[in-house]
C-alpha cells in the first residue's frame, strides 16, 4: 500500500468554526516533515504522543480535507480519510460500495450513477489491512503531512474520531454487513481504540435486513451510532428528492424500529429545488415524522440539519444560505423539541 511523496508545506486555516474535543485519544507534537518511501510502513514514522490540547481545536470549512470528501485514497479500495464537521475531526470512511450500488438516486448526490456499477463481494481481509494501515499512518502523523491534510493542525489528523460506513452507495446493501462491522471492531480493539465510535451512515432502507440488524447490534457494543437519512415528510417529496423505488413507509418503519432499540441520529439535507426551498407544509410534515418516531417509542439523539456542500448532478438543486438553514433548524426545534445541529 503506497504513501507516495508527502508534501511539507503547512497552510493557514480559515473559515467557519466547529469545536473539536478529545475525550479519548492524545494529540502529538508537530511531526518533522519527511519524504516517505512508497514501501515504507507507517510504524517507521511513529512519533511520541503528547497531552490533549487544552484549547479545543476548530474545524474550518475551507480546509482541503473538509471540502474534498473523495472516497479514493492511494491505491485502496475500501478505506479513505476525511475531516468531517459532523464527526468534528478525522473520520475514517469504509466504502463498502466501490461498485456505486445504491437504492437511492438523490438529486444532490455527487456520485456518478450514469454508468451502473457492477456488484461485488466485500473482501474482508482487504478492509482489515487497509484500515490497519491507515490508522497507523494517522496516529504516526504521516497523514497530516499529505497535501490534502497539511492545512489543518497536525493533531486533527492524528485523532481518529470515528470509523464510518459511508461511501459511494448504501452500506446496508452488502450481504455481509455484520462481518464488516466485526472486522472494524477487531481492528479498533487491536489498535487500542476500543472507545472510538463506529458509525453507520444510511438511507435506512436496509435496516430491517437480518445481517444489518446483527451488525448494528454489534456496533451497539462498540460505541456505535446510526446516522439515518430523512429528507422528506411526504411520499411525494421523498420521490422528488431521493428518487427511490423503496416505499417511504418502509423507511419510516425502519427508522422507528431501529430507534426503539438504541438512540439514533437523523441526518437531513435541506435544499432549494428550482429556486424554492422546502415548503412550510412539507417541513411541518417532516417534523411530524420525527414526532411519530418519538411517540412510537423511538429515541432520537439529535438532528443533523445540513445543506449542499459540493456540486450536484442536477443544476436545479441548490444550497440554502446559512440564514435559511438556521430558520429551518429553528422550526424543527420548535415543533419537536429535539436538539438540532446546523451544518451550513
For each predicted feature, which ranges?
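Conserved AdoMet/S-adenosylmethionine-binding subsite of the radical SAM
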Residues: 173-318
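Conserved Radical SAM active-site core
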Residues: 111-222
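Auxiliary Fe-S-binding modules of radical SAM enzymes
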Residues: 1-2, 7, 11, 18-25, ...
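N-terminal [4Fe-4S]-dependent radical SAM core
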Residues: 46-99, 105-107, 113-121, 126-129, ...
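A short small-residue
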Residues: 108-115, 162-165, 264-269, 307-309
Amino acid at each position: 500500500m503506497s504513501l507516495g511523496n508527502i508534501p511539507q508545506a503547512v497552510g493557514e486555516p480559515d473559515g467557519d468554526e466547529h469545536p473539536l474535543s478529545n475525550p479519548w485519544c492524545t494529540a502529538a507534537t508537530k511531526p518533522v516533515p519527511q519524504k516517505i518511501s512508497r514501501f515504507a510502513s507507517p510504524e517507521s514514522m511513529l512519533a511520541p504522543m503528547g497531552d490533549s490540547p487544552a484549547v479545543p481545536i476548530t474545524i474550518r470549512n475551507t480546509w482541503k480535507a473538509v471540502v474534498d470528501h473523495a472516497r479514493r485514497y492511494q491505491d485502496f479500495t475500501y478505506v479513505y480519510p476525511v475531516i468531517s464537521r459532523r464527526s468534528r475531526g478525522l473520520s475514517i470512511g469504509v466504502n463498502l460500495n466501490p461498485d456505486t450500488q445504491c437504492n437511492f438516486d438523490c438529486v444532490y448526490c455527487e456520485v456518478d450513477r450514469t454508468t451502473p456499477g457492477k456488484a461485488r463481494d466485500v473482501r474482508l481481509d482487504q478492509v482489515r489491512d487497509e484500515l490497519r494501515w491507515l490508522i497507523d499512518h494517522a496516529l504516526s502523523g504521516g497523514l497530516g503531512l499529505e497535501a490534502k491534510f497539511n492545512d489543518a493542525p497536525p493533531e486533527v489528523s492524528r485523532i481518529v474520531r470515528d470509523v464510518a460506513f459511508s461511501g459511494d452507495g448504501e452500506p446496508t446493501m452488502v450481504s455481509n454487513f455484520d462481518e464488516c462491522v466485526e472486522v472494524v471492531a477487531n481492528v479498533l480493539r487491536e489498535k487500542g481504540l476500543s472507545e472510538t465510535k463506529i458509525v453507520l451512515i444510511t438511507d435506512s432502507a436496509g435496516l430491517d435486513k437480518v445481517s444489518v440488524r446483527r451488525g448494528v447490534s454489534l456496533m451497539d457494543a462498540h460505541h456505535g451510532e446510526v446516522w439515518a437519512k430523512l429528507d422528506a415528510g411526504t411520499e411525494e417529496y421523498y420521490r422528488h428528492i431521493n428518487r427511490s423505488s423503496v416505499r417511504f413507509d418502509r423507511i419510516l418503519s425502519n427508522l422507528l424500529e431501529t430507534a426503539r432499540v438504541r438512540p439514533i441520529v437523523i441526518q437531513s439535507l435541506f435544499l432549494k429545488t428550482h429556486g424554492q426551498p422546502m415548503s412550510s407544509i412539507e417541513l411541518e410534515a417532516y417534523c411530524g415524522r420525527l414526532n411519530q418516531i418519538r411517540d412510537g417509542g423511538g429515541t432520537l439523539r439529535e438532528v443533523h440539519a445540513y445543506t449542499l456542500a459540493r456540486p450536484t448532478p442536477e443544476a436545479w438543486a441548490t444550497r440554502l444560505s446559512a440564514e435559511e438553514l438556521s430558520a429551518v433548524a429553528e422550526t424543527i426545534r420548535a415543533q419537536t423539541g429535539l436538539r438540532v445541529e446546523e451544518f451550513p
